[in-house]
């Protein structure tokens, strides 16, 4: 697949007319660009989140794929740039969830033995060519999880639907500057 290139097919740019931009419901938003799964080298995608770099003001999409997480620079929305990919921590899965706290992405998946991947998003500032990234940290206290939610005020992440506590919440203190020593807190019952 093509990597590190601006992927912009003028045929994908569609205005929102009568509630649709091309084949997609649009709610008043035009479709400016589209990147195919083929470009990501993946079979499916299920979730996305965003990050705006507080230093450069650039905006990024963090896209959950069956085999990892893609990072796309959308600072020029008509010319998105696929910067790179963080491979899955274990096996493929059709479910991956991504959230952001400060300048880090927190990623869970229903893939067995995946745990929580943490990725330092400031690494995206220096990308010149497509990269395969490594996680900045991995928490392996649980294997799979369905979702992650972050309370920015308390600096806690809540992992839901994991293989721990009958799928109940796992509380994780993410206040540390370095995430290399994350530990899950036991659920209080």
Regions found by a protein language model. Give the residues of each.
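Feature marking well-ordered beta-strand scaffolds used for ligand recognition
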Residues: 1-183, 189
